[in-house]
Amino acid sequence: SDSIVHVTDDSFEEEVXKSPDPVLVDYWADWCGPCKMXAPVXDEIADEYAGRVKXAKXNXDENPNTPPRYGXRGIPTLMLFRGGEVEATKVGAVSKSQLTAFLDSNX
């Protein structure tokens, strides 16, 4: 999806922490099956929430420093950031309805 920004250890601060909008970060890796199943869900959500929530993906294998800094221990993990702080965390694969509920209840 064009609505998703791929963030790295280097760009995380700029793209996520300093974002004026809430940011949903999806931590994933190539070998993670549940991450692949949920990817289309995140793409749809990123499009539907465009302008309200910024969607970002961080590959935890390529960017090992960022997830532990915010308490992510496993993948898939979704984190909603607001004003540079973690507002909410969801661990494990989620369905579209679960992700929508997660965003709406924290938004």
From Swiss-Prot:
Disulfide bonds join C32-C35. Keywords: Disulfide bond, Electron transport, Redox-active center, Transport. Signal peptide: none annotated. GO terms for molecular function: protein-disulfide reductase activity. CDD domains: TRX_family. Residues 2-107 form the Thioredoxin domain. One of its GO terms (biological process) is cell redox homeostasis. It comes from the Bacteria. One of its GO terms (cellular component) is cytosol. Belongs to the thioredoxin family. Participates in various redox reactions through the reversible oxidation of its active center dithiol to a disulfide and catalyzes dithiol-disulfide exchange reactions. This is Thioredoxin. It comes from Allochromatium vinosum.
